[in-house]
């Protein structure tokens, strides 16, 4: 019989960073915000977080020619996944996004968000602003 590790794959993360919630050793946390209701006549930005994660798999984590450190290890980077939301429910999406960013900030990590459209800046700024008034 196969073990769970042999049967199930882990979610794609940014640059292969560990998946999970930020803790004491994490200085930064990736958060996807798959939202595109702030754009008119053109949807698709909600696919941004997944696309960025897929493309980041092509990046080398350490390249001594350009940088003498591994950003994932140096930052203790963790990928929290994406905010679970329904794109058509704008108020709910913003509330959930603000709560997700708030949890990252309260854990002492810097949120690195991958949108979505530009409107997701509003709930992100609200959450960060609560901590840094």
Segments and roles (model prediction):
Residues 1-133:
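Metal-dependent C-N hydrolase catalytic cores
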């Amino acid at each position: 019989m196969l073990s769970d590790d042999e049967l199930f794959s882990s979610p794609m993360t940014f640059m292969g960073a560990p998946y999970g919630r930020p803790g004491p050793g994490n200085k930064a946390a990736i958060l996807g915000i798959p939202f595109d209701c702030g754009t008119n006549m053109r949807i698709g930005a909600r696919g941004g977080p997944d696309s960025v994660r897929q493309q980041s798999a092509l990046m080398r984590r350490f390249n001594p020619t350009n940088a003498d450190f591994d950003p994932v290890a140096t930052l203790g980077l963790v990928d929290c996944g994406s905010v679970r939301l329904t794109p058509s429910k704008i108020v709910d999406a913003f509330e959930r996004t603000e709560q997700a960013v708030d949890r990252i900030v309260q854990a002492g990590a810097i949120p690195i968000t991958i949108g979505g459209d530009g409107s997701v800046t509003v709930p992100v700024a609200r959450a960060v602003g609560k901590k840094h008034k």
